[in-house]
A protein has these predicted regions:
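Alpha-helical scaffolding segments of alpha/beta enzyme cores, especially the outer helices
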Residues: 23, 57-60, 95-98, 165, ...
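Short amphipathic alpha-helical face segments that pack within enzyme cores
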Residues: 40, 94-99, 287, 291-294
Length: 335
């Protein structure tokens, strides 16, 4: 593959095929292209917008060149946000994962260190003494015994390290910002994704339809890439598309300051702990319940009402099962 031919086609407003973008990733990992050409490619894609097939091809390439995580259970979910909403929320998706697991559903959480917030999923997990691993036996023990496994992105997506310096130098979002939710190395058949705007919701909706998985995509109308309860929020799934009010789930509207994750990693850790220990602010608990509930509904293939799923999530926290799940997870994965 000649990158100059790809760039010339893009200048002529041509789209790339899924196979071509897959091969681009493979070529990048083999150092076949100079940085200047990769920079031009990423800039051109960002200016015109990436197509569904192009995004899927990049995904295919990252998974093909990365380390797989083959789990010996069939049905599990990942709850993740695209990031980049610059709202610095507490670790809502990560906390929700332990609530879902505490309710008896299997979870394979894929995450990384913070990029635009104080504390990302990997920060809060590591700050509890957890050691990241790609050892498949340990990963399977975690999901089978604790009901949840954590997959630290940097151990699996080898292609990302090749483009890291270029992404940092560009100082604007690229197609790689869209790929994080799509490259979970365990390739879950269920996913709850939070996006920061409706354009992303439409894009991922088409991507998930092509992948054939069970999914829910959520966006708070005021710009959060999760259900923040600070405003109405939109949900798109395999079977419905609807705008909800917080009151529809029995929750009060939250204030923006109640969603924030604190100024330090330690403050973010304290909020995470408080939710699982059932001593958080009511708004913080409600936000996690809302996100966990839609994740549970995805796992149930939409067969349970969202009201039922909220109560399942609530019981996970109130009974102490979410906290017990987290403690078991830490015990298995301790440094």
């Amino acid at each position: 593959m000649e990158m100059k031919d790809i760039l010339n086609r893009m200048l002529n407003h041509e789209e790339l095929s899924r196979e071509e973008t897959r091969d681009i990733i493979v070529g990048i990992t083999k150092s076949e292209f100079p940085e200047e050409q990769i920079t031009a490619l990423l800039t051109g894609l960002q200016m015109r917008g990436v197509t569904v097939d192009e995004l899927l091809g990049f995904r295919d390439g990252i998974l093909a060149t990365g380390v797989p995580a083959i789990l010996d259970c069939d049905r599990y979910i990942d709850v993740v946000g695209t990031g980049g909403d610059r709202k610095n929320t507490f670790n809502i998706s990560t906390t929700s994962c332990f609530v879902i697991a505490g309710a008896g559903y299997k979870v394979a959480k894929h995450g990384n260190y913070a990029a635009t917030s104080v504390s990302g999923a990997s920060n809060v997990i590591k700050n509890h003494g957890v050691q990241f691993t790609d050892d498949i036996d340990k990963l399977n023990r975690s999901i089978n015994e604790a009901g949840i496994v954590y997959l630290h992105a940097q151990l699996f997506a080898k292609a990302m390290k090749f483009v890291g310096p270029i992404r940092k130098a560009l100082q604007f979002p690229t197609v790689f910002n869209l790929l994080g939710p799509l490259v979970n190395p365990s390739q879950p058949k269920c996913q709850l994704l939070g996006v920061a705007n409706l354009d992303q919701m439409r894009l991922y909706n088409q991507v998930y339809q092509k992948l054939g998985i069970d999914y829910g995509i959520v966006n708070s109308i005021d710009g959060y890439d999760e259900i923040s309860l600070t405003s109405d929020f939109k949900v798109t799934t395999n079977s419905y598309e609807k705008i909800f009010k917080p009151q529809d789930l029995g929750f009060e509207i939250a204030k923006p300051e109640e969603v924030r994750g604190g100024a330090t990693e330690e403050e973010a850790k304290d909020i995470f702990d408080a939710v699982l220990e059932n001593r958080a602010l009511p708004a913080q608990k409600n936000i996690v319940l809302a996100n966990a509930a839609f994740g549970i509904q995805v796992m149930e293939k939409g067969q349970k009402s969202i009201e039922e799923c909220v109560e399942i999530a609530r019981e996970s926290i109130d009974s102490g099962k979410a906290l017990a799940t987290f403690k078991k997870f830490v015990e298995i994965n301790r440094l």
